[in-house]
A protein has these predicted regions:
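PRPP-associated nucleotide enzymes
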Residues: 1-167
Length: 167
């Protein structure tokens, strides 16, 4: 597992992305994009001509764009609710999502030679990705994303809804 170094700037960005930050919309998207660019430093050894970033829709789009801009590779999107996953033809494939709670969606499409990148992953899902995981941080917290503004009773603000300014 690769976890980015927590510089002061990274800590500021993490504070913006946390569910209890109260921040939504473009400011949150910009934080995801910048964190994606920073995380991409750990993936620099990959040949951009033979690498595809696959953004999990909708929540992974901005984090994936940051990685894409930094690596200058290929880019695709995947909607697990509406599509069957088709592995891109490049040697290197990076599946990108903003939040991984259980890891089930990723586990269903992950091959042994693919990478996973995320802003945050629940500690219980880390083992599903093993040494293929690139993350900003690992969290002990896990809750169901919902259209609420505050965390309570196992539910919290849905990251995708926050990214698109819908709560």
């Amino acid at each position: 597992m690769y976890e980015i170094e927590k510089t002061e700037r990274v800590k500021e960005l993490i504070a913006v992305t946390k569910s209890d930050s109260g921040i939504s919309g473009p400011e949150l998207c910009a934080a995801h994009m910048e964190l994606g660019r920073i995380l991409a430093d750990g993936l620099r050894e990959l040949d951009p001509d033979d690498t595809t970033v696959v953004a999990m829709l909708r929540g992974g789009i901005f984090f994936a764009e940051g990685i894409y801009f930094a690596l200058r590779c290929r880019f695709e999107t995947f909607d697990p609710k509406r599509q069957e996953f088709v592995r891109p033809g490049t040697k290197n494939v990076i599946i990108v999502d903003s939040v991984i709670n259980t890891g089930k969606t990723i586990e269903d499409i992950l091959d042994l030679d693919m990478y996973v990148a995320c802003c945050v992953i629940n500690e219980n899902a880390v083992a599903k990705c093993k040494d293929r995981l690139y993350t900003v941080r690992v969290s002990k917290n896990s809750f169901v994303g919902a259209g609420v503004k505050k965390q309570a009773a196992g539910r919290g603000p849905d990251t995708t809804m926050r990214l698109f300014n819908q709560i």
